[in-house]
From Swiss-Prot:
Family affiliation: Belongs to the ESF2/ABP1 family.
Alphabetical UniProt keywords: Acetylation, Coiled coil, DNA-binding, Nucleus, RNA-binding, Transcription, Transcription regulation
Membrane-spanning segments: none
Organism: Pongo abelii (Sumatran orangutan)
Role this protein plays: Could be a novel TATA-binding protein (TBP) which can function as a basal transcription activator. Can act as a regulator of basal transcription for class II genes.
Name of the featured protein: Activator of basal transcription 1
Protein encoded by which gene: ABT1
Residue ranges of domain RRM in the record: 46-142
Amino acid sequence: MEAEESEKAATEQEPLKGTEQTLDAEEEQEESEDAACGSKKRVVPGIVYLGHIPPRFRPLHVRNLLSAYGEVGRVFFQAEDRFVRRKKKAAAAAGGKKRSYSKDYTEGWVEFRDKRIAKRVAASLHNTPMGARRRSPFRYDLWNLKYLHRFTWSHLSEHLAFERQVRRQRLRAEVAQAKRETDFYLQSVERGQRFLAADGDPARPDGSWTFAQRPTEQELRAQKAARPGGRERARLVTAQDKARSNKGLLARIFGAPPPSESMEGPSLVRDS
């Protein structure tokens, strides 16, 4: 009896062991398939936007700082305008500084090989100091990072090409406007020269314009002196003025009251 019961138990345990082995094999197969799928899955890169770039901060600096958190791909920094750089140089020259200013940047984009790392870096480093060391020149500058969702490097290239095209069109429009103004000025000058040549005034051989103005006091006196008898009247008037000044001077010296006009002879009235 005991032998029969042991045989039955052995026969019952054999199918159980077989089912366990099949389950283990299926699990191993699923794990291997998952691993194969994971190896075939393409890693999607992610781009982080830098809104603030301190002076003298270069792409090599950002690559060295962010490579500690993940693999960094392409890096692009937008340079400042030439007008701003020219103003900085002029200010430095006016202040007596002979130091040459290098080109600074206004914004930048950093590409990470894995977008999950890019999200993690943007979320953890935002508003934190750039330099960890005490002597770092960027210690008091903060990271201004933002992860750009569904943004690829091709979008950035298209955006930069569009801005470059807009800048060229604006420059062409400004050049055309300046050319139109210059042509209008030259046409006006030529029209004025033709008008002067057609006028034929011998008093203006060089084409200069004359304007009628009111005569000055000196011109009026010269005209009166040029009249017949005008020189004698002018001589008498100057002599009378000199006599008045002499009498006033003597009166101030000796303390006598100055002679009144009634005590003097009748004054000559100038002819108008």
